[in-house]
Regions:
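N-terminal secretory targeting modules
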Residues: 2-3, 13, 24-208, 218-220, ...
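Bacterial N-terminal signal peptides
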Residues: 11-18
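Short, solvent-exposed loop/turn and secondary-structure capping segments
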Residues: 149-155, 216-222, 253-257, 290-292, ...
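Catalytic nucleophile-elbow at a beta strand-turn-alpha helix junction centered on a G-D-S/GDSL motif
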Residues: 202-227, 248-251
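Structural recognition of the beta-strand scaffold that forms the well-ordered cores
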Residues: 204-209, 213, 241-246, 276-282, ...
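Oxyanion-hole/transition-state-stabilizing segment in secreted/luminal serine hydrolases
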Residues: 218, 247-300
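Catalytic His-Asp segment of secreted/periplasmic serine-dependent ester chemistry enzymes
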Residues: 262, 288, 325-401
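Surface-exposed amphipathic alpha-helices with a cationic face
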Residues: 305-313
Length: 401
């Protein structure tokens, strides 16, 4: 009797361990995300998205066998009708084409069609899909008749989206050659995030930034933002989520383009799935747009950093501070602006507020003229070029491993 009880207890213990292991392999983590924005007429296709299909390409960080897609109408004032959404492997030779054998349609509450309500975002149902690390994934949205004039979007996709008209009231087939032949734009529409089922220990880093993070100066469709290089370097060793939440022209405190970081932080950073690390690399525009009262603006920027750091740490997120890179040679540079940058960078390095520092300033500045970027890393003395972004991404990877 005693032996039977011992055996039963052992079986229960083993079953419990097995279930725990299964749960650890079965949690959602973010593999891709973008910061959604309110768009203007200049950011939309020449014609509306109504009764058209839009194929959009994203570069995921790590893979898995189950995924879900988050769509957003958070800045829309009207519903968005969607007939269907499907994903597929992007053709390796032609960005607008897909491998038709890999097409899989997403469902929303068990249905292909869905309506995105104004001010809302929603996830698709779970989709079994063999997603690979570093993959270029095509996401095609077949829009219905009713779409707003200004879609919730991300302006700086740095990839081309391919838009085609429906035929006889029906979306064209996934393999239709019309993709790439009608209208092409370099924006994303209604896309927000992709999550993958993975091990609970898979790390995820979110990056809060401006145009340097958003990829100004990169090569369209080549996926050479510094966060792309970061994702590739990290995933060469193990699965690692890298989420780029940069917005071109964005500020931390106020002003700039789109909602400032202080306003968008809860949605764009804390709202992502499974984030356990955060890089704050923003402040260039707060400094560059400053027209006076420089010391006060720098102090305010630091005070806002403290708020963001506290919010992240309250959620158990490790926070990395990235120093602001040089601007000499660009129109934003002046003695006073440089003094602000030095003041803020000094605080980032020495305050002890961040868990760790990623010193991009020291990395990419010209040793002979430290207020200026190295010539080989920049084409406009403000943003980096692909060579500079590669150096940044690989450097950051060593800090984040």
């Amino acid at each position: 009797m005693i032996n039977r009880k011992k055996k039963l207890s052992l079986m229960v213990a083993l079953l419990s361990l097995a279930c725990t292991g299964l749960e650890a392999q079965n949690v959602w983590k973010g593999t891709w995300a973008t910061a959604v924005e309110k768009t203007g007429k200049e950011d939309m296709p020449k014609e509306s998205l109504s009764n058209r299909s839009c194929r959009q390409i994203v570069h995921v960080s790590f893979g898995g066998n189950e995924m879900r897609l988050k769509l957003s109408n958070e800045f829309g004032k009207h519903p968005v009708e969607i007939c269907s959404v499907y994903v597929a492997d992007t053709d390796k030779d032609k960005n607008s084409s897909i491998n038709a054998k890999t097409v899989k349609y997403l469902k929303f509450g068990g249905k292909k069609n869905v309506v995105l309500e104004p001010g809302k975002a929603l996830y698709s149902d779970v989709l079994k899909y063999a997603l690979k690390s570093g993959q270029r994934l095509s996401i095609t949205i077949d829009y219905g008749e009713k779409t707003p004039k200004n879609a919730t979007s991300h302006r700086g996709s740095r990839t081309t989206s391919y838009i085609v008209a429906q035929v006889n009231g029906k979306p064209v087939s996934p393999a239709d050659a019309a993709f790439g032949q009608q209208e092409n734009v370099d924006h994303w529409y209604n896309l927000s995030a992709i999550d993958v089922k993975t091990d609970a220990k898979t790390p995820v880093v979110a990056v809060l930034g401006n145009s340097i993070t958003d990829g100004r100066g990169t090569t369209t469709n080549m996926h050479n933002r510094w966060t792309d290089f970061l994702a590739d370097a990290l995933n060469a060793e193990k699965p690692y989520g890298v989420l780029n939440l940069g917005i071109g022209g964005n500020c931390v405190v106020e002003g700039g383009i789109s909602e400032p970081a202080m306003k968008r932080f809860d949605r764009d950073i804390l709202g992502q799935t499974g984030v356990d690390k955060l890089v704050i690399f923003e402040g260039t525009n707060d400094i560059g747009c400053c027209g006076g009262n420089y010391e006060h603006v720098a102090d305010t920027l630091v005070a806002c950093y403290k708020v963001l750091i506290a919010k992240a740490k309250a959620k158990g997120i490790k926070v990395y501070g990235a120093t602001i890179t040089p601007t000499k040679g660009n129109g934003w540079y002046s003695y006073w602006h440089e003094a602000m940058r030095q003041q803020v960078n000094e605080w980032i390095r020495k305050s002890g507020s961040f868990d760790e520092i990623i010193d991009f300033d020291e990395l990419v500045r010209d040793p002979q003229d430290p207020q200026r970027l190295k010539a080989e890393y920049s084409d406009d003395w403000l943003h980096l070029n692909p060579k500079g972004y590669e150096v940044m991404g690989k450097f950051a990877a060593e800090k984040l491993k």
